[in-house]
Amino acid sequence: MRTSSIYIITGAVLTALLFTVSAFGHEHTALNGTWTLVPAQSNFEGQPVIQTGTVTINERAGDITVSRSFKYEGANDTFFYRDLTDSQNSATIHTGKDLKTKTRWDHDVLKVTNTYKQSGDVTIESYSLGPDGTMLVSVMRPDHKPITLVFERK
């Protein structure tokens, strides 16, 4: 009788361990792909309107690449940003002398924190999947109202 109790307890512990390892090994691939901005559904809060924009996210084995390309209303140039970070090991990527970028997963929300070294300003971008399958991006910058950008999968 005592032997069967040990097997039951051991089995329960191993099962719990298996589920714990599976949860921590989870890759966040739902946001992977190229997304196109839907300006009419986005809220710019009085900031310069983005005419066109794409975001490409690739999360694989803890390495995350976020590429962003935007063209602002009235501007002749297209702005391109690309961050490659290692969220699994909490790496911080220094992009040139002026920018430090860090990504992390907060449950199913991808958070990209950009710190501008000279000013110390911090911009936080939060990427999440909306209930209708769109990607919602919330951008919080110092001294600005938060903006919400809506993207559709390309």
What is each residue range found by the language model?
Residues 25-154:
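Hydrophobic small-molecule pocket/channel-lining residues, especially in calycin-type beta-barrels
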Residues 10-20:
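Bacterial N-terminal signal peptides
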Residues 7-9, 35:
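Short helix-onset patch at the extreme N-terminus, typifying the N->h transition
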Residues 1-6:
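Positively charged n-region of N-terminal signal peptides that target proteins for export
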